[in-house]
Amino acid sequence: MNINSLWISTTPRTGSMWLYNVTREILKFSKINVLPTKIPKSSLEFFEIFEKQSLIDQNNSNKYVFKIHRILNPNLPRSKILTTIRDPRDVCISFKEFMKTDFNSALKAAKDLLQYEKIYKTYNKDYVKFFRYENIENKS
């Protein structure tokens, strides 16, 4: 399968921005043309680029890196999901502190992370790659 789209898909406060930036930099270092060049502001924009550009792009030098905070389908064409997982207790604390929100919203973010992990563990192992936040944090 010719994968040209990498999806960073997880909840906020789990290292997703770090993974997004590192993925883009590794591809650039490998002399791959990383798209989109202008970073979209919303999930909708990422999906539009995926549908209108990535799916029809036959240039093997082009790779698309998308970052969204929602669970993806198990069968996106030409795609691979990269997802981060983190101790839900740490997600709850981090979300509350950095997002300046109440405890119930932070608890929901932690529960959402468990849902991502539960669902993504049912997907084909060649389609999803897990990155533990604690490993990112300890080796950076």
Locate the predicted segments by residue.
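PAPS-dependent sulfotransferase catalytic core
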Residues: 1-63
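PAPS-dependent sulfotransferase catalytic domain
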Residues: 61-140
